[in-house]
Amino acid sequence: MNASGKAVIAFSVVGQDFFPSAGFASLDAVNGAGAIVISAPGALPDYGFTGYVPFGFRSARWGDYSRAVADESGAIWLGNEFIPNGPRDILANWGTFITMVNP
């Protein structure tokens, strides 16, 4: 939330029509939640190699790398996980997308 009371929530968008993508929605006390915005569309499925050992790697780690912070100008910066179409290593294919929003 910035000093004007405007907020943005960062999240992943995944579904039948979406590979893991970076998304956000604006929030404010007057209008409530805004529309979902895809800031970076995912290009590929999650390979699942970054699974949790206690679960036998059956459950891939996902969604624990989203962040939002307001700067002194009122802009809100977001960092989200998504699956880009680019270089990957042997254990993971996710990337980070940074978005600046002026709510």
Where are the regions a protein language model picked out?
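C-terminal PAP-associated
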Residues: 1-103
